[in-house]
């Protein structure tokens, strides 16, 4: 449970039907070792009919394929252990269809099909129980073939989405460059002050005496997102405070602005005090970030002694802990 909470739990934005993202993060962000026991079995209490089972497998395959292509850096270097003999089971069906399309004799094609099917029965006799050997092969023959088609379709759709994403991004950059060069129209950068709350009292802070007042001056996410949207495409969107990560809705603000005004760069300063909160908020942003950069500036006032003198005891140590933890995210989101 502690590990689950430490690395951010489940990724709600990753629609894969399965929780594979959690295991990948556990391996890449910590020293955790995932061990799969060959004797482990699980029983799902689902009342499947053939077509409901087929429908779920097709959806799972589509979503998993799309998610893997859409998050290549996350899945890079990972392997999924599936018995190679399972992958052979659907092969007789496409080979039969191809041979028929090429004009082969139906009896010859059927002979090839039955020969390959018989070979599958021999290879998979240790996978299926004796009573379900033939039925299991028939089901996976059909379902597996449909899963292949679903995976190919997901790949095709992904590249269409990717082309559209790059074209829209290019258009937004072009609009911003025209504005910047000719100094015309709406701004290409905006800075939004999202909170006056801060946990530190730095000596040089020009409004340290007014921090944490009863009215922190925090606009709701909807207002911040709407104002950014009204500026149109942005080159740079900056958040300011206070300590921005003190807002529980921080990731909602950033993700909303990214969706509505497509800034190429999103940046903010932090004192690095809240290690886990900063990590989880950053993770939620990166999980939704498909284009552009997300930049975090750490406020450092010198070596540990001088830094702590200005910002408070242990502030340098906490900053370093936060930096080290965020750096691990580069393994997943370079």
For each predicted feature, which ranges?
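Conserved nucleotide-sugar donor-binding
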Residues: 1-8
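Catalytic donor/gating beta->alpha subdomain of glycosyltransferases that bind UDP-sugars
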Residues: 11-16, 20-76
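A short acidic, helix-capping loop that chelates divalent metal ions and anchors anionic groups
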Residues: 45-47, 212-214, 304-311
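Basic/Trp-rich segment in TM-proximal cytosolic loops or flexible interdomain/linker regions
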Residues: 50-108, 130
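Membrane-embedded multi-pass helical conduit in multi-pass membrane proteins
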Residues: 88-162
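Conserved alpha-helical substructure of the radical SAM core
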Residues: 168-294
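Conserved radical SAM core fold
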Residues: 244, 272-276, 298-313
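Conserved strand-turn element in the central/C-terminal portion of the radical SAM core barrel
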Residues: 268, 323-334
């Amino acid at each position: 449970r502690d590990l689950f909470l430490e690395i951010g739990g489940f990724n709600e934005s990753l629609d894969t039907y399965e929780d594979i993202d959690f295991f990948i993060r556990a391996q890449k962000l910590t020293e955790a070792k995932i061990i799969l026991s060959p004797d482990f079995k699980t029983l799902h209490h689902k009342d499947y009919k053939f077509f409901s089972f087929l429908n779920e497998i097709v959806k799972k395959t589509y979503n998993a394929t799309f998610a893997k292509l859409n998050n290549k850096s996350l899945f890079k270097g990972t392997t999924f252990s599936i018995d190679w003999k399972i992958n052979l089971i659907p092969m007789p069906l496409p080979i039969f269809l191809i041979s028929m399309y090429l004009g082969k004799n139906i009896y010859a094609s059927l002979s090839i099909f039955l020969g390959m099917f018989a070979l599958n029965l021999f290879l998979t006799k240790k996978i299926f129980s004796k009573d379900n050997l033939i039925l299991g092969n028939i089901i996976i023959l059909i379902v597996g073939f449909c899963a292949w088609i679903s995976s190919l379709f997901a790949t095709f759709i992904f590249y269409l989405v990717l082309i559209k994403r790059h074209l829209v991004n290019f258009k937004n950059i072009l609009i911003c460059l025209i504005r910047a060069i000719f100094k015309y129209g709406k701004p290409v950068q905006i800075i939004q002050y999202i909170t006056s709350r801060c946990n530190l009292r730095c000596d040089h802070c020009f409004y340290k005496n007014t921090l944490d007042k009863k009215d922190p001056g925090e606009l709701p996410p909807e207002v911040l997102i709407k104002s950014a949207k009204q500026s149109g495409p942005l080159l740079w969107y900056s958040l300011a405070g206070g300590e921005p990560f003190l807002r529980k809705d921080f990731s909602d603000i950033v993700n909303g602005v990214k969706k509505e005004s497509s800034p190429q760069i999103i940046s903010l300063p932090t004192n690095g005090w809240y290690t886990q909160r900063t990590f989880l908020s950053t993770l939620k942003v990166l999980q939704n970030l498909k284009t552009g950069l997300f930049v975090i500036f750490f406020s450092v006032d010198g070596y540990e002694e001088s830094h702590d003198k200005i910002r408070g005891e242990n502030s340098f140590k906490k900053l370093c802990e936060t930096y080290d933890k965020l750096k691990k995210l580069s393994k997943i989101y370079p």
